[in-house]
Amino acid sequence: MTAEQRQNLQAFRDYIKKILDPTYILSYMSSWLEDEEVQYIQAEKNNKGPMEAASLFLQYLLKLQSEGWFQAFLDALYHAGYCGLCEAIESWDFQKIEKLEEHRLLLRRLEPEFKATVDPNDILSELSECLINQECEEIRQIRDTKGRMAGAEKMAECLIRSDKENWPKVLQLALEKDNSKFSELWIVDKGFKRAESKADEDDGAEASSIQIFIQEEPECQNLSQNPGPPSEASSNNLHSPLKPRNYQLELALPAKKGKNTIICAPTGCGKTFVSLLICEHHLKKFPCGQKGKVVFFANQIPVYEQQATVFSRYFERLGYNIASISGATSDSVSVQHIIEDNDIIILTPQILVNNLNNGAIPSLSVFTLMIFDECHNTSKNHPYNQIMFRYLDHKLGESRDPLPQVVGLTASVGVGDAKTAEEAMQHICKLCAALDASVIATVRDNVAELEQVVYKPQKISRKVASRTSNTFKCIISQLMKETEKLAKDVSEELGKLFQIQNREFGTQKYEQWIVGVHKACSVFQMADKEEESRVCKALFLYTSHLRKYNDALIISEDAQMTDALNYLKAFFHDVREAAFDETERELTRRFEEKLEELEKVSRDPSNENPKLRDLYLVLQEEYHLKPETKTILFVKTRALVDALKKWIEENPALSFLKPGILTGRGRTNRATGMTLPAQKCVLEAFRASGDNNILIATSVADEGIDIAECNLVILYEYVGNVIKMIQTRGRGRARDSKCFLLTSSADVIEKEKANMIKEKIMNESILRLQTWDEMKFGKTVHRIQVNEKLLRDSQHKPQPVPDKENKKLLCGKCKNFACYTADIRVVETSHYTVLGDAFKERFVCKPHPKPKIYDNFEKKAKIFCAKQNCSHDWGIFVRYKTFEIPVIKIESFVVEDIVSGVQNRHSKWKDFHFERIQFDPAEMSV
C-alpha cells in the first residue's frame, strides 16, 4: 500500500464509517487481524453500534504494515457485497455515495412513519439488491422474533447505510408495488424538496430533526442574541424565521434600498446570511407578474459547493427555484436554460464569462441582482472583472437595457501598494468603480454587538532561529554546481545562460530562473537535427534535476532534512524506472555517491530544524493550557503540508493531535490536488469534536471556505498581503484565540507589521470615504470608470486568428517528430487527440497508476515517447465512448513551423492558436 492510499483512507474514513459494518467482512480479513482485535470489533458493534465498530476496524487496518492488506480489504468489500464502497475507494471518488446523503436524511426523519406503515417482509425481496445478504437475514430474523416494527426499524437502518446508488428509487418502486401508504411520503422522482414538504404537512407542528446551516462560518448558525454552540442553534425548527443580528441588518440596509454595495465585514460575522437577507428582500419586492433573477458568484469550488447548499436549503422552502453550475457540470447542461428556469443561480464566474463570450447568454440584463463573494478579487483579468467589464461597457455605452444591482462581499478591500491614506482611498475607489458600488457598508452603529460575535485574535510574531550550519545544503549545492557545469558544457551557446550570477540555491528566484532556462533549451535549434536532439534532451535532463535539487533545499529549509532526502530518493527511483540513458546514469551516480553522507546528516539529531522545535513548543504550551484547542496551521506548499503532517504523527508528544490536511484541487509540477469529496471529508473531521485537533492547510483555507471555529492559528513561514493577513487571522474565531507567525526571516516579520499598518490605513480610509456626500463619491467613481474604459479600449487586442498552416509537434525532451497539427482533433471542448496509426507507433503505453472513469472517458494508460532512452510523458490513453484514443498535453511538446522552422512552447492549449477541428467518429472508421 502506498502512503497516498493510506492518507486517502484516513481522509475518507467518515464516508466509510457511515456505510461499513465491519462484522460483515471480518471473515475475509481474519488472516490480517489478530483474534483479539476481531473480538474487540464485535464487542464494539454490540455495545456502541456499527459506526463505532467501523472506526475501530479502520484504526486496526491503518496500523498494518504487511504488503497486500489494502487489496485484501478491497476484495473483502467486494465479496461481502459492498460494491459501491469498493468502487469509491478504488477511484477515491465518493460523489455517488455523497449524493445519497439527502435521501438518508429524509429516511431518518420519516423513520417513525416507516416503522408504523411498512412490513419488511412485503418489500424485502424487492430491496435485496440494495442490501448485504447478511442484512437481509438479520431483517427477517428480527421481523420473526421481535415483530413488524422492529424489523422495519432494522430495514431503515440498513438502507441508511446502503452504498447502492439506486436504493432510493428501488425503495420507491417496492413501496408502490406493495401499495404502501409510505409511498405517498417517499417520492424520489419529484425530488427531495417535494418529499420533505409532504412530510412537513403530515408532521404538523412537530419540530424538524433535520439540521440546516445558512451561514458563511459555523458560529453564525447562532443568529439570535444568545450565542451558543452550533449543535444548539442547528436544532431550531426548519421553518422558524432566523433572526438576524442588528449589525447584519445594518450591513444589509444599503443593498436592500437597491444601492450597489460593497459589504466589508470581518470573517466570521455571517456575511453569507446578510446576502440571504438581501436576496430574499430583492426577490419579494417585485410586483405580481414580474420576477427577479439572482446570480451568486463563488470563486473557489469548495466555496461554490458550500454556498449552493446554503442557498438551496434557505430558499427552496420559500418556493424559489435554485440551481448551481460549476466547470464540472457546465458541459452536461444548458447554462442558458438553467438561468431561464431558476430564480437563484450559484455560479463559478468563469462559467458566465464563457457563456457571455459564446453568445449563449446575450447580456447581464437577464439578471436583476449579482452577488460577488470575495469581491476584492475584482481586478486585472480575473473573471469577476471580465464580468464587470461587460457591465460597465453596457452602462457607459448607449444601451438602454436595465442592469442588475451589484453586491460585493469581502473581509478586506485591501489597499494595494498604498503607503498613505490618500493612496489607499484611491485604491478603494478603484474597487468601487470596478463593482459600480455607490456605498461601502461596514458596521458602525452596532460595533459592540459585532465584537461579541467576532473575536479578534491576539497576534504574536516569533522570530525563530535557522540552522547555524547546514551540511545537507552544502552537499546538495555542490551537486547543483556540478550539474550546472555539465549543462554549460553541452552547448557553448546555451552555456551562457548558466553564467548569470546571483542565483541562490534553494530559493523561489532560482526556481523561476531554471524554468526560464528549461524553456529556452527546449526550443533551441541547430542545423544538425541529430545534434539538436542530443543537446535538447541532455539540457532537459540537467534542468529537471536542478529543479528537483532546488525543491529539496526549499523543503529542508522549513521541514526535516529527511523529508527533503526522501523527496530526492523518490525522484531518482522514478528516473531509474523510466528511460535510463547515459546522462541520467551519470547524474544518478553522483547523487548516490553522496547518499550515505546525506542519510547520516539527515538522521543526526543536532541537525534538527530550529523552526520545528519552536513550532513544537508553541503547540505544547497551547495544548497544555487548553487541551481542547483546535488549530489551523497555514504553510506555503503542499510538500510542506505532507512533511509537517508526518512530523506531527511521528512525534510521540504531538501525535494526539491527529492532523488533517487541506490543500487545493489544482495540479502542480509536484503533486495532484485534493478532490472535492476529500476536502469536504477533511473539513467534516476537523469540525467533529473527537477527530482532528489540527488542520494543516495551504492558501485554499484562508478564503471563504467554511471552517469550524478554532482558537489557534499558526502561520508557518506564511505571509501575504493585507487581505490574506485579515483572512487567515479571521480563522481564529473563538474567544481568547491567538494567531502566531513563526518565521526565521526578519523581512517576513517586517512585512506582517507593514500589513498591520496597512489594515489601520484601510479602516481609516473607509471611514473617510463614508463621510463623502453621495455626489462627490459618485463623481469620483464615474471618473475612474471612464478613464479605465478608455484605457481598456486603447489596449483592446483583436482575437487571435487561428493559424491554418500545418505545423509539427516534436517531443519536448528529445525533439523526435510526434505528429502534425492537421491530425489533431478536439474532443468535448478541452481534450486533444491525434488521428492515424502512424502516431500510435511513436508512443508506448504503460498502465495508468490511477485508472479512473469520468464523464465519457476511462483513463487506461499513460503514453510516453517511444524513442529509445527518452520516455517523455506525452499524456494518457483513454476509452472514449466506444473508441480507444490517445489524449495529449501540449506542454509535453515543442511546436515547429514547417516553413520557417521556428519553434515555440505552449504551456496551455488555449495559448496555441491553430485551426481546431472537432472530433468526428466517422474519421475513426476510415
From Swiss-Prot:
Main enzyme class: hydrolase
Glycyl lysine isopeptide (Lys-Gly) (interchain with G-Cter in ubiquitin): where is this cross-link? 48, 96, 154, 164, 181, 190, 193, 813
Q: Which GO terms describe its biological process?
A: antiviral innate immune response; cellular response to exogenous dsRNA; detection of virus; gene expression; innate immune response; positive regulation of defense response to virus by host; positive regulation of granulocyte macrophage colony-stimulating factor production; positive regulation of interferon-alpha production
Domain named Helicase C-terminal is located at: 611-777
What induces its synthesis?
By interferon (IFN).
Chain segments carrying region Interaction with ZC3HAV1: 219-926
Which UniProt keywords are present, listed alphabetically? Acetylation, Antiviral defense, ATP-binding, Cell junction, Cell membrane, Cell projection, Cytoplasm, Cytoskeleton, Helicase, Hydrolase, Immunity, Innate immunity, Isopeptide bond, Membrane, Metal-binding, Nucleotide-binding, Phosphoprotein, Repeat, RNA-binding, Tight junction, Ubl conjugation, Zinc
Which cellular compartments is it found in? Cytoplasm; Cell projection, Ruffle membrane; Cytoplasm, Cytoskeleton; Cell junction, Tight junction
Q: What is its EC number?
A: 3.6.4.13
SMART domains from the entry? DEXDc, HELICc
RNA-binding recorded as keyword: yes
Q: Which reaction does it catalyse?
A: ATP + H2O = ADP + phosphate + H(+)
Which family does the similarity line name? Belongs to the helicase family. RLR subfamily.
Q: What is this protein called?
A: Antiviral innate immune response receptor RIG-I
The species this protein was found in: Mus musculus (Mouse)
